[in-house]
């Protein structure tokens, strides 16, 4: 049976441990007296802590390689499952802050004070507790094949959305302003109701 790729990788990882076996073999020779000249292998036998440090480094490298392989496999499976579901278009929220050239403090105050929201518009609360039921995953992923829109495209999309929202608010408020005010009590609508 031929060794597989994992067996070959295991053998390659064990190659740095080969000098450790020579150190233990050299320490088995007890004929060397400390006063005599000892062969180089026997000198290494007194440095057992070096082998322990090398073994610890090897184990950390092995753990790192294993963790990165597991992470790579999990991310690949995750992007593979996401590619089967069609991505629905989701609107982008963006903030455009105008910058004046007068001074940084003035431009900051001006940009924040010049933003006026309609009364019916719900402001995003950035510092509140997120509701797990309404949380939506981010629109763009780092592993997606397409890039997010550029800054200019986001600004155009926001302006287009504001322009669409602005006329609809104006048309809703116009009929209320054109209705005549009644001076008497409440009138019941019906065929006999007269309009001045």
From Swiss-Prot:
Major location (coarse): membrane
Regions that span the bilayer: 47-67
What are the boundaries of the region Disordered?
162-196
Q: Which UniProt keywords apply?
A: Membrane, Signal, Transmembrane, Transmembrane helix
Keyword ATP-binding in annotation: no
Q: Indicate whether Lyase appears among the record's keywords.
A: no
> Residue span of the signal peptide, if any?
1-28
Q: Which domain of life is it from?
A: Eukaryota
Pfam families, per this entry?
A: TMEM52
Q: How does it sit in the membrane?
A: Single-pass membrane protein
Q: Which cell locations does it reside in?
A: Membrane
GO cellular-component term (any): membrane
Q: Kindly provide the name given to this protein in its UniProt entry.
A: Transmembrane protein 52
Give the species this sequence originates from. Answer: Mus musculus (Mouse)
Gene symbol of the encoding locus: Tmem52
